[in-house]
Amino acid sequence: MDAMEGRTSMKDLTDDISLSAFRRQVEVATTTATCPSAAAIEKGIPIYDGAGASETVAAEWRAILGEGAGVFVVKRAFKDLGAIDAASAVFRDIIADERGPGKAAGDHFAAAGANDRIWNSLQKLCLRTPDVYARYMANPVIDMACRAWLGPGYQLATQVNQVRPGGKAQAPHRDYHLGFMTPEQMAEYPEHIHRMGPVMILQGGVAHCDMPVESGTTKLLPHSQNYLPGYIAATRPEFRDYFEENCVQLPLEKGDAIFFSPALFHAAGENRTADVTRMVNLIQTASAFARHMESLDREAMSLAVYPHLAALSPEGRRAVIAATADGYPFPTNLDRDPPIGGLAPPSQQDLLTRACDEGWDADRLASALAEQSGRRRA
């Protein structure tokens, strides 16, 4: 009988959740056969050199995220460390502005107030300092990783997490979408949704400083994304205990990036240093076909960054446009926004790309974006 036959929800599988079965999934070696282009494998995690990253490695990254280790690191993902420093300065200003009596941005999996958190740091950086944003997001490695897993039209958002000395660790977990539900809610969704959910999201992060393991770099359990009932299992004490006993951590240097499946068991670590304030810009990227966690004003972001796009390289400009504008033309109002000469109307990314190619002035772009937005409303 097919394993799917007769199952209508994950409730049918919860009684079969087994730590021994989980261990068989995760206690496997990561070999060069699964990541031949990697510069090294450390603690079961493939390590790549950003200087040599190209589109040819996309299939390899897909395999790692899908059925491989579930995580990889790109050293020197940012060639321009000045862009990291400039963005870090802006983020520190935002943290200072948002911190105040009675204010705490909170953390989904750690105590409120233990860390500094900037929600929607992508939009805040773009609107506050669009020149820094353009320089920062003109990063082909981030674009390649997102395209490798999600294809074009992806929706990128970021959140800054700054952990001061003494900052506590997160509880181990899986991430959005299903990871942000109670076990009872998770169990309402059928098995194929638990299989499909991780395909719709890519998690990642950019190191904004040198981060030794003692500063609390992310704790990871390679291959744990392969355990189907893992969203529910990750909430259970015996699985959390196993995670704490077997997880691995890697040091990161400023400009390194890490990418992993949202289904990978992971948790931010405790900052046990006396003098390292760990800052990471967390990246959460959704498929064009998925709902994102955060809402962004991508029209305002497109207008803010537009004057700075002409100075970028073609690949840098493509990366910034992909991170900024909406790449999927639906949902829309097909009475007012019908597809003409194709199957879909132009997306916001199409419009921003056309403006760059044809050298529009800012007023023309603003009018075109406003008209497009108006056509899409119900």
Per-range role (PLM):
Residues M144-A145, Q170-A171, L178-Y242, C247, ...:
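Catalytic core of non-heme Fe(II) oxygenases with the double-stranded beta-helix
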Residues D16, R24-P183:
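Non-heme Fe(II)-dependent double-stranded beta-helix
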Residues A234-P307:
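Catalytic core of Fe(II)/2-oxoglutarate
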Residues G6-I17, G50-A53, H208, P212, ...:
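Active-site environment of non-heme Fe oxygenases that use a 2-His-1-carboxylate facial triad
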Residues M1-G66, V320-A378:
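Fe(II)/2-oxoglutarate
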Residues D80-G82, R164-G166, P212-E214, Y227-L228, ...:
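Flexible loop/turn segments at secondary-structure boundaries
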Residues D85, T217, Y231, E270-R272, ...:
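Short conserved micro-motifs at the rims of enzyme active sites and ligand-binding pockets
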Residues Q159-V160, G204-V206, N281-T285:
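A structural signal for short, well-ordered beta-strand segments
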